[in-house]
Amino acid sequence: MKKIIFAGGCFWGVEAYFNTIDGVLNTKVGYANGNTEDPTYEDVCTDSTGYAEACYIEYDEKQLKLEKLIDAYWKVVDPTLKNRQGHDEGTQYRTGIYYVDEEDLKVILESKDKEQEKYDAPIVTEILPLKNFYDAEEYHQKYLDKNPNGYCHIPKELLKKH
């Protein structure tokens, strides 16, 4: 089982989206790559902790290649927007790909270079090793499953199983 962490705006929609992809085994939302210990949602929203709202993904690499997972990620973010996705603004809403396995970096960078060809503006998505990850509060986990009419910056048609 492999792991990758994606930040792409509000983590509710990011988690719901990746749960529709065959080969994704587990997801959880939380706070990635910040500079305090055990932050709360309220802490992260102050814009002072350095954390990104993120989705931690475990996937079966025999069934789902990292390239396909990253391609899916690019479909639901605007990687040229700094600290913003949809109506959400702030450093916690930045885009980021945080890797656990150093060997994944080459695949991530190749995908970013390919994606850059679609844009005139530079891609500002962070690509960094995962420094730390803290689980978000329980009410955030699988939020859109519990609240189907909840806010989501990702189009609803992309949240159907595929």
Swiss-Prot record:
Pfam families: PMSR. It catalyses: L-methionyl-[protein] + [thioredoxin]-disulfide + H2O = L-methionyl-(S)-S-oxide-[protein] + [thioredoxin]-dithiol; [thioredoxin]-disulfide + L-methionine + H2O = L-methionine (S)-S-oxide + [thioredoxin]-dithiol. Belongs to the MsrA Met sulfoxide reductase family. One of its GO terms (cellular component) is cytoplasm. The active site is at 10. It is an enzyme of class 1 (oxidoreductase). Its EC number is 1.8.4.11. The keyword Oxidoreductase applies. Gene3D superfamilies: Peptide methionine sulphoxide reductase MsrA. One of its GO terms (biological process) is cellular response to oxidative stress. InterPro entries: Met_Sox_Rdtase_MsrA_dom, Met_Sox_Rdtase_MsrA_sf, MsrA_MetSO_reductase. This is Peptide methionine sulfoxide reductase MsrA. PANTHER family: MITOCHONDRIAL PEPTIDE METHIONINE SULFOXIDE REDUCTASE (PTHR42799:SF2). The keyword Oxidoreductase applies. Has an important function as a repair enzyme for proteins that have been inactivated by oxidation. Catalyzes the reversible oxidation-reduction of methionine sulfoxide in proteins to methionine.
